[in-house]
């Protein structure tokens, strides 16, 4: 037996050089042995360690290590539970067929990155689905001519009726002047009513009956014993009361009709009578010259400085005796 010296190796140095090199650098697929990783955030995940001896594993252990390696790569691809040998082999054959030996090419957080990317894709699809109803709404919105900015019916009739004091029938440009010019005449026409349908001899009786509706300001009778007359009330409310007697029977045997007066000659009677009077009147006199403001203010300032004489102020006498007294006493 050879004696043993301190510092000398037991075996020859050349036979044990492979103990100091990782097996995956030498291309040896049998040096991978799995063991549990207690620091892994996921359950059922195995870590990879490399054996120091190329021949220290049995064939059964090699098969088990290969299955564990495939299970590891399948779990990193998205599996969260324990996977069998058949399912892990299928997943490994689809994704990691070219990484049977060597160190792992995926980190511990690669699966977390894949999971974080997947909800973003789902959210992107959800946004596309949400945008599609908006696009259909916009298309239906632009198909309506009343809302399109360049369409002929650019102003909606309902909005015009709500926002415009002229009503929905008045156009924004053309109908404005007509409505303004006829505004005063329409107000006068609200006070006038037309009463018709009565016999010519019952005109006074019908007029007496309509006095209960309000104060009658003016009456225009029909020519040649006609069966109508125009009555003007002092207010719109009184004329509305008279309109309630339309198609009503008066005095038991006379049915009358009442409506708004549409005869422009009657409605504009006051305006027509007032226009000639204005034309016949005196011509306008030429305006007088405007006094300068500076002169007027100067005169007012001088009046304040003038002292008005008062009667009660004593005056010095200028008689002969007064002059003699001044010479004697030196006053």
Swiss-Prot record:
GO biological processes: mRNA transport; NLS-bearing protein import into nucleus; nuclear pore organization
Domain RRM Nup35-type as annotated: residue spans: 187-268
GO-annotated cellular components: nuclear membrane; nuclear pore central transport channel; nuclear pore nuclear basket
GO molecular function, one term: structural constituent of nuclear pore
Keywords: mRNA transport, Nuclear pore complex, Nucleus, Protein transport, Translocation, Transport
Biased composition (Polar residues): 8-20, 35-56, 84-104
InterPro entries reported for this sequence: Nucleoporin_NUP53 (IPR017389), Nucleotide-bd_a/b_plait_sf (IPR012677), RBD_domain_sf (IPR035979), RRM_NUP35_dom (IPR007846)
Tagged with keyword Transport: yes
Transport keyword on record: yes
One Pfam family linked to the record: RRM_Nup35
Main location: nucleus
Cellular compartments annotated: Nucleus, Nuclear pore complex
Region Disordered, residue ranges: 1-63, 79-110
Protein task: Functions as a component of the nuclear pore complex (NPC). May have a role in the organization of the inner nuclear membrane proteins at the nuclear envelope together with Nup154.
Subunit structure: Interacts with Nup154.
Similarity-based family: Belongs to the Nup35 family.
Protein name: Nucleoporin Nup35
Natural source organism: Drosophila melanogaster
